């Protein structure tokens, strides 16, 4: 497969082309292209600096992207992504839907947690720390980053309910829950008359479709919005990679070269031919396939340069596939 020729982004298509969807059964509307902020403050990227982060965030807002997804653990140092975002947003805070997460090991940055990071005690510590770093009074979407086996989900949901009542959090979501855990959380929230989770984040892409077995059926059964992470498989579906490798400064080549080396290149070549026959980029086809999946609300894609943000923002408007074409792509990558 030959590397795709870079297509200049259609800047004129910006705001007018962006689609917005309701996140689950809520009144929260988000852009179908989200910005993953895990690279903010990460070494060896342009967004390692505050200036680079400012440029990417500014480009995203100008492009009509409203969903910004981070976590307290993101960045070269724990909390650094949130700090960079807080410094960058300023008066543009009201222009975005700010999503962050809690529940990972912060190495003591948030104080002692005794591994119970879904507990009422820890959630209170974590949210106050995130609010300080983000320089904001509220978080639009506060997400449990992973299940806490030490804390009953009843306690976690009750603690999050308190934050909503106080106005520090508007909506709640979760990440990395299994299908049965999604069902359990739904039942517990209803039983206690607590606010329900409105979103689920799990890994999902053409090359990682495990979520189709239990997670997506649960998401759709309970009306949650689905926010896939690694939707472009760490950048493999940007069209910049081939059997021989890709950009040396890319996330894959610098951190996870095995993903490119172990990719099913016969299938990737067939996918490239599918795209070439329709005069579309692999990025456009991949965004279209993702956004055609039931329940999928927004494709959260990372970026370290403004031009990457621009390319992601206009990708969904580049191609309107038929149901048969979506099925053909699915069949190419059948697990």
Residue spans for each PLM region:
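Active-site beta-loop-alpha junctions enriched in small/polar residues
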Residues: 38-40, 71-73, 101-105, 144-147, ...
């Amino acid at each position: 497969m030959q590397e795709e020729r870079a297509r200049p982004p259609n800047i004129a298509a910006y705001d007018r082309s962006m689609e917005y969807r309701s996140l689950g059964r809520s009144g929260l509307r988000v852009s179908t292209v989200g910005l993953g902020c895990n690279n903010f403050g990460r070494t060896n990227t342009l967004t390692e600096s505050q200036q680079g982060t400012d440029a990417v965030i500014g480009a995203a807002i100008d492009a009509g992207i409203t969903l910004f997804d981070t976590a307290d653990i993101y960045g070269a140092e724990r909390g650094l992504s949130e700090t960079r975002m807080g410094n960058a947003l300023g008066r543009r805070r009201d222009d975005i839907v700010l999503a962050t997460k809690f529940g990972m090991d912060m190495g003591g940055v948030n104080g002692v947690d005794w591994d119970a990071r879904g507990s009422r005690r820890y959630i209170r510590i974590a949210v106050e720390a995130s609010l300080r770093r983000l320089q904001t009074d509220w978080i639009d979407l506060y997400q449990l980053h992973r299940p806490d086996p030490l804390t009953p989900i009843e306690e976690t949901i009750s603690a999050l309910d308190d934050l909503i009542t106080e106005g520090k959090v508007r909506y709640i979501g979760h990440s990395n829950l299994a299908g049965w855990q999604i069902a359990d959380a739904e039942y517990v929230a209803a039983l206690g008359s607590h606010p329900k989770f409105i979103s689920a984040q799990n890994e999902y892409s053409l090359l990682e479709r495990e979520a189709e077995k239990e997670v997506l059926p649960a998401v759709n059964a309970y009306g949650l919005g689905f926010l896939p992470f690694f939707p472009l498989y760490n950048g493999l579906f940007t069209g910049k990679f081939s059997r021989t490798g890709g950009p040396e400064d890319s996330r894959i080549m610098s951190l996870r070269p095995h993903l490119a080396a172990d990719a099913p290149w016969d299938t990737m070549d067939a996918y490239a031919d599918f795209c070439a026959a329709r005069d579309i980029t692999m990025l456009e086809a991949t965004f279209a396939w993702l956004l055609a999946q039931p329940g999928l609300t927004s494709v959260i894609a990372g970026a370290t340069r403004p031009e990457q943000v621009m390319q992601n923002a206009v990708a969904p408007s580049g191609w309107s596939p038929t149901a048969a074409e979506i099925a053909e792509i699915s069949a190419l990558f059948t697990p």
